């Protein structure tokens, strides 16, 4: 099992190109199931989760060509409507094949999801929405089985804001008969990117980027060509890395407008951030100020940046509160940050972080995707060497992170389990 070895204390400088968004690429790949014509995608990140999704689609009979950030999908010969446990257990986003399969083929059998160990994240909103559209759904032997001759448009009000739920129901609705209205829809940019692809494929969707999506169902979708939006979480992670380690770094192929909640907090921390249409420059040469924040749905501060910003707060001057409102059990990185010398206590869904002047390198273990990124950020600032175990979590969501950091001057190397 690979590990990362990081020697702290080196400021970062140079340029980094931000990859395509994982959380846009995964639903967009699933959208390829909705048409018998080819869908050509660009700026697809090379991540473990993307490779897993392509493997799943391949098992279903989708013909795939991929390489150099490009993926072409041809779902004209899909012959297997099952997403098995072996695939779904490693990646929750596999649930996103449910809506497209039921909408186009009238049947789907999807294992109940796994993925990051950060709370329940139930799929009941997906199921309720599809049932409202006329699907017959049973759950037995660990599988969700859905059947429908043709889904019927309806009004769906989700009990909670759910990103994957919105995406699944949106993909189902584009081929349903009549009008579907999704109220309390997730507004995340990644949902918007999926919607834009669907429109390019011939779907009729109004309200993109709002919490009310109105979809007029069509009989079939055609092929399309689409470029995946930049990954705002990868961009935010690099911004926090520079803020912690110090330095002067320019991010390319980024969308500053969808990062405003993060950059606002970075400026509050004393970081200098400049931005243009598709670039950001971040500079830092001092200890950050402690910043209190609360996670919430877009456009508020993203839960997927909570761990990285907490790592920054560990070395800040002052005390901060971090309130996690989206997922329970999303403070698993706290114990590991404390091993590096951080001073963090937890009370329910709130973490109290008292900044320390210096962290010290140690052996730590990644527990989930964003937690692993927080340990990398802390290690860049720590005194001495840090060994991060279980970095397969990092590989699920970051495209060559150690390569990009090394190019910026960080001392990072990947070692196999036998070398560590």
Curated annotation (Swiss-Prot):
The modification 2-(S-cysteinyl)pyruvic acid O-phosphothioketal is found at residue 116. GO terms for cellular component: cytoplasm. GO terms for biological process: cell division; cell wall organization; peptidoglycan biosynthetic process; regulation of cell shape; UDP-N-acetylgalactosamine biosynthetic process. Its main location: cytoplasm. Its EC number is 2.5.1.7. It catalyses: phosphoenolpyruvate + UDP-N-acetyl-alpha-D-glucosamine = UDP-N-acetyl-3-O-(1-carboxyvinyl)-alpha-D-glucosamine + phosphate. It is found in: Cytoplasm. It is an enzyme of class 2 (transferase). Signal peptide: none annotated. One of its GO terms (molecular function) is UDP-N-acetylglucosamine 1-carboxyvinyltransferase activity. Pathway: Cell wall biogenesis; peptidoglycan biosynthesis. UDP-N-acetyl-alpha-D-glucosamine binds at residues 92, 121-125, 304, 326. CDD domains: UdpNAET. Coiled coil: none annotated. The active site is at 116 (proton donor). Keywords: Cell cycle, Cell division, Cell shape, Cell wall biogenesis/degradation, Cytoplasm, Peptidoglycan synthesis, Pyruvate, Transferase. Phosphoenolpyruvate binds at residues 22-23. Pfam families: EPSP_synthase. Cell wall formation. Adds enolpyruvyl to UDP-N-acetylglucosamine. Belongs to the EPSP synthase family. MurA subfamily. This is UDP-N-acetylglucosamine 1-carboxyvinyltransferase. The gene is murA.
């Amino acid at each position: 099992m690979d590990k990362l070895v990081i020697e702290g204390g080196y400021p970062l400088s140079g340029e980094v190109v931000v990859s395509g968004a994982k959380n846009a690429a995964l639903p967009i790949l699933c959208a390829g199931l909705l048409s018998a014509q080819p869908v050509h995608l660009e700026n697809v990140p090379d991540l473990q989760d993307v490779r897993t999704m392509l493997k799943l689609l391949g098992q279903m009979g989708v013909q795939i060509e991929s390489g150099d950030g490009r993926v072409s999908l041809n779902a004209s010969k899909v012959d297997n409507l099952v997403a098995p446990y072996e695939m779904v257990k490693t990646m929750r986003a596999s649930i996103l094949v449910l809506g497209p399969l039921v909408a186009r083929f009238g049947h789907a059998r999807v294992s109940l999801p796994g993925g990051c160990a950060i709370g329940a994240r139930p799929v009941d909103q997906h199921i309720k929405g599809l049932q409202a559209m006329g699907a017959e759904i049973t759950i037995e032997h660990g599988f969700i089985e859905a059947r429908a001759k043709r889904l019927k448009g309806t009004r769906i009000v989700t009990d909670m804001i759910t990103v994957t739920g919105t995406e699944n129901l949106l993909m189902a609705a584009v081929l349903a008969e009549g009008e579907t209205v999704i109220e309390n829809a997730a507004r995340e940019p990644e949902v918007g990117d999926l919607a834009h692809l669907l429109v390019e494929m011939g779907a009729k969707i109004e309200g993109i980027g709002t919490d009310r999506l109105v979809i007029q169902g069509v009989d079939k979708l055609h092929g399309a060509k689409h470029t995946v939006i930049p990954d705002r979480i990868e961009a935010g992670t690099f911004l926090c890395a520079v803020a912690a380690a110090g330095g002067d770094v320019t991010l390319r192929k980024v969308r500053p407008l969808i990062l405003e909640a993060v950059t606002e907090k970075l400026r509050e921390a004393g970081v200098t951030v400049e931005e243009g249409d598709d670039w950001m420059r971040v500079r830092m040469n001092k200890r950050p100020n402690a910043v209190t924040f609360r996670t919430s749905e877009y456009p508020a501060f993203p839960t997927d940046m909570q761990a990285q910003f907490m790592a920054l707060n560990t070395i800040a001057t002052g005390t901060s509160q971090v309130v996690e409102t989206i997922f329970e059990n999303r403070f698993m990185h706290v114990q590991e940050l404390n091993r590096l010398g951080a001073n963090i206590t937890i009370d329910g869904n709130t973490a109290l972080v008292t900044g320390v002047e210096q962290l010290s390198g140690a052996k730590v273990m990644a527990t989930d995707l964003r937690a692993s990124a927080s340990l990398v950020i802390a290690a860049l600032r720590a005194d001495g060497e840090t060994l991060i175990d279980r970095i397969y979590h990092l590989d699920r969501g970051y495209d060559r992170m150690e390569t990009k950091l090394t190019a910026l001057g960080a001392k990072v190397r990947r070692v196999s389990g036998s070398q560590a």
